[in-house]
Amino acid sequence: SQPDTQTAEQDFLTRHPDAVVFSPKKRQWGTQDDLTCAQWLWKKIIALYEHAAECDGEVVRPKEPNWTAWANEIRLMCVQDGRTHKQICEMYNRVSRDPFWCRNVLSPSKLREKWDELSLRLSPSVSTYTEKREDPYFKASYD
């Protein structure tokens, strides 16, 4: 079984030479940039837990993530969804400052799943737009 595992890993690395974390069996992998982005997200999440623990002694630090799965999800956000690592980090910065979303987006997969909703809800321009906008149809119906 050992030679088969080594062969599978070598074949995988031949197909994905920039993979620094990978699981040939699960077909998951990530580049160094994907892993770095995943680790940055983890640091932000740990900071949220540490802040919560200051107020509530029952809060326990979560276990380390599966780095291959996290880096793979980051890679998919870049490759399939067209996001950059910078955009991913900027979005998570906004998420981490929101009282609701910081509790509900605690992984790259959840960030990816909720991206469209988050980009609208957490966009600074949306709250400004809805506050300043006057809808003539709405106003006319109540005048």
Go through each PLM region and give its residues.
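Append "and, occasionally, other polyanion-binding protein interfaces
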Residues: 1-143
